[in-house]
Design a protein with these regions (language model features):
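Acidic, surface-exposed loops and disordered segments
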Residues: 1-163
Length: 163
């Protein structure tokens, strides 16, 4: 699948098949996150891949809107070392991971992290140093169903020269 098709067909998936994802595929997806743009190329990220069902359940239970993480094959926690642009850098890495998952025929869903009260709890659970901040939790797996939700048409969001 080419990059444009991947971006135009990506969607948030919250229901997954009970099917594992190959380690090589996961590593390729994370490698795409690693290659994201970052301010002054600082690359402040660390990626924690969680396949263990019991740990995924703990993560799902801590979140307020991520219960489906428990049924996904994988949860990727994206953390960035605290700095001026940690949120932008980590968000770029997260989007690369979402697109890479789609390119591999997988579904994914970005669960917010940075502004959530559970962010420090998640960092402790996964053993991160105190100077790392949770950017996102990403559920990844084989989607239980296909289809795309409606999106706003381009004419509603594109403006030339001014609003």
């Amino acid at each position: 699948m080419d990059a444009i098709e991947c971006m135009k067909t990506r969607r948030s998936v919250r229901a997954y098949l009970d099917k594992p994802v190959d380690r090589e595929v996961i590593e390729d997806i994370i490698d795409c996150g690693r290659l994201a743009a970052s301010a002054i190329n600082i690359q402040p990220w660390q990626f924690i891949v969680v396949q263990d069902a019991a740990l995924r359940k703990k993560i799902a239970d801590i979140t307020d809107y991520g219960k489906f993480i428990e049924q996904a094959a994988v949860c990727v926690a994206v953390f960035c070392q605290d700095g001026k642009y940690y949120l932008e850098d980590g968000s770029a890495a997260t989007q690369n991971i979402l697109n890479a998952a789609r390119a591999h025929g997988l579904g994914s869903c970005w669960v917010a992290g940075d502004k959530k009260e559970y962010a420090p709890v998640m960092a402790r659970l996964l053993g991160l140093p105190e100077d790392y901040k949770l950017i996102s939790l990403i559920a990844i797996g084989y989607a239980a169903s296909e289809g795309n939700p409606p999106k706003k048409p381009l004419t509603e969001v594109l403006h030339w020269e001014q609003y």
